[in-house]
C-alpha cells in the first residue's frame, strides 16, 4: 500500500491492536522493527501519541479503507483527521540492517 517494504531481511514484524494502552503500544513499538496496527478508528490519537513517544513518527503511514477501491495512503505526520475510518491500519516500516 505504501510502495515500500514493511520489513527487511531479519526484521521482526509485530501486529498490534489499537485498543492496547498507550504504555503497551509504546513498549511494543519500541521493541520491534516494523509493525501493523489495526483497530485505529477511535484510538488514533492514542496510537499517534505512542508512535511519537517511541520516536517512530517518520516511519508511520496510515492506510484508510485498506484493500478497498477507495483506499488512500498518507504519512501519519501529514494526517489531520482526529478519527480514522473503520477500515484503517497504520504501518510502521522497518529499516534495513
Region roles according to the model:
Residues 1-28:
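Class I SAM-dependent methyltransferase SAM-binding "motif I" and its flanking Rossmann-like core
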Residues 31-97:
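A contiguous loop/helix-start segment that scaffolds small-molecule binding in enzyme catalytic cores
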Amino acid at each position: 500500500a505504501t510502495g515500500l517494504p514493511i520489513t527487511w531481511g531479519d526484521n521482526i514484524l509485530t501486529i498490534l491492536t489499537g485498543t492496547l494502552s498507550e504504555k503497551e503500544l509504546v513498549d511494543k513499538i519500541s521493541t520491534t522493527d516494523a509493525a501493523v496496527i489495526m483497530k485505529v478508528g477511535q484510538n488514533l490519537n492514542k496510537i499517534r501519541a505512542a508512535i511519537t513517544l517511541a520516536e517512530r513518527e517518520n516511519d508511520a503511514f496510515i492506510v484508510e479503507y485498506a484493500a478497498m477501491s477507495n483506499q488512500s495512503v498518507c504519512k501519519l505526520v501529514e494526517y489531520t483527521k482526529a478519527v480514522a475510518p473503520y477500515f484503517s491500519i497504520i504501518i510502521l516500516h522497518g529499516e534495513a540492517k
